[in-house]
Regions:
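Structured catalytic-domain cores with a bias toward divalent-metal coordination
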Residues: 1-181
Length: 181
């Protein structure tokens, strides 16, 4: 049975709904104020990893490296660290036989938008990672996208069109977590 959020009487965040992930540059909401306090005044993590939805059509996930050109205002260690961790993720996916993870020009993500959780981390000399993964509790189909059927530099291990289940998305996220650790 298809699930629906139509019966929910209100947004799950009173003022910004799902856009609270875009509030990190301004910190106008209680959630982002608290996260910024923890990230930049208390914990000082070396890596900030944001799991997000949804992946590009014809793939399962987008994972770093991000597309060029890189934002030149960051210390060179930031994009180098992002690229190294991204390479570790992609190597682990290949080793585990998990197909359909794209990078760089496989999607629109870059280091130039500075309002989100992973991008504000760059200004604190922290490596910010973002993955965008398909899937929800309702099974969905990976569509046939002709240009995503053959391996490329940005999609070295393509995935065939198929039915996709949320558990598979969780398994991909776990692979990324282990690669980062």
């Amino acid at each position: 049975e298809r699930r629906s959020l139509a019966g929910i009487p209100r947004a799950y965040q009173k003022y910004v709904g799902h856009d609270n992930n875009r509030d990190f540059y301004m910190a106008s909401q209680a959630e982002t104020v608290n996260m910024n306090r923890v990230l930049y005044r208390e914990w000082f993590p070396q890596i900030v990893y944001n799991h997000h939805q949804t992946g590009p059509p014809g793939t399962v996930m987008f994972a770093p490296p991000f597309r060029d050109p890189i934002n030149y205002v960051f210390d060179p260690l930031i994009p180098a660290g992002i690229n190294l961790l991204g390479a570790g993720m992609h190597a682990r996916f290949a080793a585990e036989g998990k197909r359909g993870v794209t990078m760089r020009d496989g999607s629109s993500y870059s280091t130039w938008w500075n309002g989100g959780l992973r991008t504000t981390a760059y200004f604190h000399n922290q490596i910010g990672l973002l993955t965008e993964t398909i899937g929800s509790p309702t099974p969905s189909d990976i569509p046939f996208i002709p240009e995503r059927q053959l391996p490329t530099g940005d999609l070295p291990f393509p995935i065939a069109p198929q039915r996709w289940h949320f558990r598979q998305s969780i398994e991909y996220s776990i692979t990324c977590n282990l690669a980062v650790l």
